[in-house]
Structures are given as structure tokens and as C-alpha cells.
């Protein structure tokens, strides 16, 4: 293992991350909100740590090996979440313990959107901005790692996706080099953020709210600058804008690149994963609207329509915004929505969950097993986009699903052991493992009431979900650490 190469990259990451503390610092100084000193100290600590890692190995030229890539990907979130917690920890308002600060930081960077904070409307403006910025930075990291780095390690949904689907994204790389790929993705991500912010602003949000919510919308994060989330604005137009951008952000960013290059919007509909993604959103929305209408949950049909559509898209894409308390919805709707987050969005997007592409392959494998029972001697290939999928890919999908299920059960049992009720335990793990945010029971609105051990368990859940299980678990095997 190239330890020096890993240390150098960690040092560079921390040094770059320290510069992201300057915007909230400037906002604090301008607004005199009392958080200037925490951000100054946080900046100096993070910069010093980055230089401390980088300086002794600055002259080493060895390239990281494949094995090092796994460690670097995990450290990306572990280290940044740790140092990202410092401003929360040092802040007087809000006053946060270590578990709370790390939880909030991890939730931001993994774009989970679960929060331990209450009274957001009264918090310092710099802290509010910092939370939103954490999600935006985390979202960009997710895209670059998912599309450019993880496939080289043989992990992640995009590895399955681009290797098997013909058409606009069949190439092994978007552009010849990772650096160029990252740059292309950066422009798309930045462009979507600017477009989203402008749309929010034109719809009536303040400039601060528009920028902050564009950060968490495009990142599919779910953090808001208000306790009532998007419901604070009470605007169908703003809700509609959020729905559009949540769907766009839930689609494979490599596909966005291909659409821009080909200048053909129909490219989206030619993609099997996108078709299933949109079909699932439509189907669940119809079910939700029927149940809400029959139960007379809202007196106004327009309110039924907007709340129903918004919450389905928000939860199914794992964003986690709310316009209403969906946990109070009738019948099976709350459970259905929470379970929908386990599927999530498309591979190569900022969405959480298992990803649509894996769900498609699991369904096709199930269909094949049934057909095989009827025709035992037949050779029935699984096809995606008209092209056979190798058995190794199917095995990888089932391996992921098995580990995902096992991790879910273990984490849920661990949460139950902390003393929370079953609904809270299972929904909290579901929400954090799928990077959703809001759950049911005691975590329907926030996670402030969860004990310190429970918060650490959920931090692991968030990290495990964001790293798509394999990346983190591979570090726990003795084989990985042998020379």
C-alpha cells in the first residue's frame, strides 16, 4: 500500500476543504452573527492538519494503487466529516456535543439530510449557510467518485450501469481522463445549481434561501434553512421547481453529459433506467393521490395534488424535503414512502438507496428464475437495453443486496438496543442507510431525541449507505491489510 500517496491526498483534501470555511466565515463577519471565532479556529485547525499531512510527503511521486483507492474513498468522507464537525462543536449557538456535531457534519456531506438541530429560523445565518454548503460539496464528491473513481475500483452502481447498457453511456469513460471527466461533471453540477437558484429566486425566495436550497436540492440533500423545510414558503410554484430539480438530480449525471453533447432530450427516454425511474415516480404518485383523496386528508384538491406529488418525489429520490407531515398520512403511505427510499434514484446521481439499475436486475433475475422453473433446460439470458448482462454482474448485484440486507438488520437491531421503539429504530436506519433523512416515529422531524450511541450507529449507517456497502466493508477484511 502506498501510505505516502494516501497521506498526500488526505492532506490536499483537508487543505482544499479549509478554503470552503471562508465563505461562511465571511458571511458571519458581514452579519456579525457571533460565529466568526468558531469559523476562524476551524479554518486554522483544518488548514494546519492538511499541511501537516501534506508537507512531509509533498515530494513523493508514486501513484495510488487500486487497493489505495478503497482507503482514499472511505477517508474522503470520514476525515472531512470529522473536520467538518469542528464549526458545530465550537459554536455557541447552536451548542452541540461531539456526537451531535459529527452527526450533523456526516449527514451533510453524505447528503442524508437528517438533523439534530431545532429552531433553524433563529440560528446564525453563517451556520445555516455552512450546513447547506456541506451538502453541496458532498454531492459533488459523490458524483465524481460514483462516475469517475468507483468504477475503476470495480464497485458502485455505475460500474454495472456503464459496462452493460448500450447507447449514449456505453463508453468506459465520459472523457479520456479522470481529470477531464471530473471537470465536465463539475460544470454540469454547477450549471444545475445556478439554474435551480435562479428559479427559486424568481419564484419568490430570498437570495439567501434560493442559494441555500439550490445547494441541497441539486445534491439531493434535504437540509433547509427553515424548520418547516419547503413547506415554509407555502408556494406551489416553489414546490414545482423543487420537484423538477429533484428529478433531474436523481438521473445519472453521465447521461446529462451525453444529452448535452448530443443535444437530444430524447436520449433520456432511450435509457432503460430513466424510464423505470420516471415510471416508478408516476405510479407511486398515483397511488398516493388516490389514498389521500379517498381519506380526505386535505380539503383542497390542489393541496392534495401538490403535497402528494412533492412528498413522493422528495422521498423516492431520497432528498427528504417536506411540505407537510407525511408521517401522519393515512393507511400504508408513510411505510411505502420510506421503503421507496431503499430503491432510490439512478446510478451516477446524487441520490441514495440501492439504485434503480440494481432493482431492475434483481427483478429480471427473479423473472428468469420463474421462467427457468417452467423451462428447466432453457438458457435464458438477462438483457438490459437489448444486450445480455454477464453472470458476474448479476452475482455482484445479489452480493450487494445480501450485504445491504444484512447490514440493515444488524444496524436496526443495534438501534433497538439503544432503547428506541421498533418503528423509530427501523425507520431511522432505513432513512440513514439510504441517505434519506426524515424517518417515522421519534425521528419524523429530527434526530435530537436519539441517544449518543444511537447517533454513532446512524453515522455508520449514513457512511455505509453513501459508500454503497462494499467500499467500507472491504476495509474490514484482514485480506485487504495484508501486504
Predicted regions and their residues:
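Membrane-proximal intracellular helices of multi-pass ion channels
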Residues: 1-483
Amino acid at each position: 500500500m502506498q501510505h505516502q500517496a494516501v497521506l498526500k491526498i488526505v492532506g490536499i483534501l483537508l487543505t482544499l476543504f479549509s478554503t470552503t470555511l471562508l465563505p461562511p466565515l465571511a458571511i458571519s463577519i458581514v452579519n456579525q452573527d457571533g460565529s466568526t471565532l468558531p469559523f476562524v479556529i476551524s479554518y486554522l485547525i483544518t488548514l494546519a492538519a492538511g499541511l501537516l499531512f501534506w508537507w512531509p510527503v509533498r515530494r513523493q511521486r508514486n501513484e495510488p494503487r487500486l487497493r489505495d483507492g478503497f482507503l482514499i474513498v472511505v477517508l474522503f468522507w470520514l476525515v472531512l466529516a470529522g473536520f467538518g464537525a469542528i464549526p458545530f462543536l465550537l459554536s455557541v449557538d447552536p451548542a452541540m456535543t461531539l456526537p451531535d456535531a459529527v452527526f450533523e457534519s456526516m449527514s451533510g456531506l453524505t447528503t442524508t439530510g437528517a438533523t439534530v438541530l431545532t429552531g433553524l429560523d433563529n440560528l446564525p445565518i453563517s451556520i445555516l449557510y455552512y450546513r447547506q454548503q456541506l451538502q453541496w460539496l458532498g454531492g459533488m464528491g459523490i458524483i465524481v467518485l460514483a462516475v469517475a473513481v468507483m468504477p475503476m475500483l470495480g464497485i458502485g452502481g455505475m460500474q454495472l450501469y456503464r459496462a452493460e447498457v448500450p447507447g449514449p453511456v456505453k463508453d468506459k469513460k465520459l472523457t479520456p481522463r479522470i481529470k477531464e471527466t471530473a471537470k465536465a461533471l463539475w460544470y454540469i453540477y454547477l450549471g444545475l445549481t445556478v439554474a435551480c437558484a435562479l428559479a427559486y429566486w424568481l419564484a419568490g425566495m430570498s437570495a439567501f434561501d434560493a442559494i441555500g436550497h439550490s445547494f441541497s436540492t441539486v445534491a439531493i440533500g434535504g437540509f433547509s434553512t427553515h424548520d418547516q423545510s419547503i413547506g415554509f414558503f407555502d408556494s406551489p410554484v416553489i414546490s414545482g421547481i423543487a420537484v423538477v430539480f429533484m428529478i433531474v438530480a436523481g438521473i445519472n449525471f453521465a447521461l446529462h453529459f451525453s444529452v448535452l453533447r448530443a443535444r437530444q432530450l430524447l436520449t433520456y427516454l432511450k435509457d432503460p433506467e430513466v424510464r423505470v425511474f420516471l415510471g416508478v415516480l408516476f405510479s407511486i404518485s398515483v397511488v398516493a393521490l388516490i389514498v389521500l383523496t379517498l381519506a380526505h386528508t386535505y380539503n383542497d384538491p390542489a393541496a392534495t395534488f401538490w403535497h402528494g406529488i412533492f412528498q413522493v418525489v422528495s422521498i423516492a429520490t431520497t432528498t427528504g424535503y417536506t411540505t407537510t407531515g407525511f408521517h401522519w398520512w393515512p393507511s400504508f403511505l408513510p411505510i411505502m414512502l420510506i421503503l421507496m427510499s431503499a430503491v432510490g434514484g439512478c446510478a451516477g446521481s446524487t441520490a441514495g438507496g440501492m439504485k434503480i439499475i440494481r432493482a431492475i436486475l434483481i427483478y429480471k433475475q427473479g423473472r428468469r428464475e420463474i421462467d427457468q422453473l417452467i423451462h428447466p433446460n432453457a438458457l435464458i439470458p438477462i438483457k438490459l437495453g437489448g444486450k445480455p448482462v454477464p453472470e458476474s454482474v448479476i452475482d455482484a448485484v445479489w452480493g450487494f443486496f445480501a450485504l445491504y440486507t444484512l447490514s440493515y438488520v444488524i444496524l436496526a437491531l443495534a438501534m433497538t438496543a439503544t432503547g428506541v421503539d421498533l418503528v423509530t429504530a427501523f425507520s431511522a436506519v432505513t432513512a440513514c442507510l439510504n441517505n434519506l433523512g426524515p424517518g417515522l416515529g421519534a425521528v419524523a422531524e429530527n434526530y435530537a431525541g436519539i441517544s449518543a450511541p444511537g447517533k454513532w450507529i446512524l453515522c455508520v449507517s449514513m457512511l455505509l449507505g453513501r459508500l454503497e456497502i462494499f467500499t467500507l466493508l472491504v476495509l474490514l477484511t484482514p485480506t485487504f491489510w495484508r501486504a
